[in-house]
Amino acid sequence: MSQNLYRRTPLMGWASWNYCRTNISEEKMKVQMDALISTGLAECGYEYANLDDGFFGGRDENGRLLFNKERFPNGIKVLADYAHSLGLKAGIYSEGGDNTCGFLYDNEGANGTGVGLYGHEEQDLNMFLDEFGFDFIKVDWCGGLRLGLDEETQYTKIGKIIDEIRHRTNRQLVFNVCRWQFPGAWVVNVADSWRTGADINPNFPSVMYQVDSIKPLARYCGPGHVNDLDMMQIGNGLTLTEEKTHFSMWCMMSTPLMLGCDLTKLSEATLNIIKNKELIAIDQDEACLQAFPIKDWHSEKGKLLAEIWIKDLGKKYSNQKAIAFVNRSIEPITLDLKAEEAGLIGKILSVRDLWTHEELTCINEFSVTVQPHDVVIYKVESESSVEVVNQWDQGEVEFVATNKISMETALKLVKEGAMLIDVRSPEEYEQKHLEGALNYPYSVLDGFGDVAVPDKNTTIVVYCSTGKRSSQAKNLLETNGFDNVYYLGGVEEL
């Protein structure tokens, strides 16, 4: 078996969704591909240009996919060809069920109806990956969720077909499962990467939520198989300091570095962040190990303020480590660390600041002052090392399906004092909502506990119109410490 058929390190590139959603076109894709070259990003390793949802145009009488003629008058194979002509790789999108997320949320109508892989797995995958020559495929789950499909069964079927194409064509293909939560241990043997949390938003709490979502998942990260924290929100409104922390933590976690902004409008300061070759090397380290926190600081009320994370480089229990000092708070904070706490034993041979690119004094005790929402990252080498126990690794993570409760159960919980939360947009909420429901759009739930419900034991029932946003909301709230969250799912009459 050729090792070249499988990518060993996390993906790097650009994807269309965060910037365009379904408002994408052949011209826009080519502009961003050109920008990967002109900005020098491709030289740094950003080589994938991935087309997300928004290109479908239904199916013909033989079940073959059609493509949106206004957005893609020449079809989509031209995009794979164009990417390859630039020395890039091309990615494509599909859905594990019948209807795409764009159909459900972006008014794609007939264009997104019945265009998912369900019932057309071999036909579509062979077209995308063999006939058209795409190198990557992301498979979403909006339609699969609505159909009530078993995700392990369906994604495993898809993965087997992709693997057959991979070996038949002798091409490296990358398969991403997009289920908006960790699917379960089975996914490691099926996909190259998998989403672990709700969709990322362009704000700092959402960035840190993504990081928190994979704290217990380090055991599932390794060469060729990584936890996916979602496309980065760099270039979409974060401060430069927050972009720096965002990028740093993605590199520490060995997760795909996929940009999701307009590359033609990036500032030099932002480009310098995402072109930091020393940080990219941390992300692309051959051992592909995930960082984990070893120390943390909390407020008097228990709010997490700061952490120190370590990442082994080259191998487990290495004497070379990346150490991240992270300040989540809005005040400067000084973080202290003894080298042995990070498993670094004996004489310290080198200490390098990966943002200032300076060699520092070799010391065994660190005292680092970190500014609000900022990060400091050192690469440290010692004479020897010992194991540091990852306290977050509690064994195999049990996958808990997001099971719906009935309307009857939901109303009973509300009658007993539960909060009923509509996670749709304010506009959707105003048009029609369930009686007694409060409106907290999914996009603002990251800071929900700080502004709305200080008691994390509050019983909460979440719903939307189709199921995806409320499924993600349940996942997000549970990651943020809410213990009693119930999923009503999609309420079709809304």
Where are the language model's segments positioned?
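Aromatic-lined carbohydrate-binding/catalytic grooves of carbohydrate-active enzymes
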Residues: 32-148, 152
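Structural recognition of the beta-strand scaffold that forms the well-ordered cores
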Residues: 10-16, 45-51, 89-94, 135-140, ...
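Carbohydrate-binding surface patches
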Residues: 250-253, 258-260, 300-344
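Glycan-recognition surfaces
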Residues: 120-123, 164, 168, 172-262, ...
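C-terminal beta-strand-rich structural cap/linker in extracellular carbohydrate-active enzymes
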Residues: 363-392
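Flexible, polar/low-complexity N-terminal or interdomain linker segments that lie immediately upstream
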Residues: 386-431
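Catalytic cysteine-centered active loop of the rhodanese-like fold, especially the PTP/DSP P-loop
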Residues: 440, 449-494
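N-terminal module-boundary/linker segments of secreted carbohydrate-active enzymes
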Residues: 1-26, 30
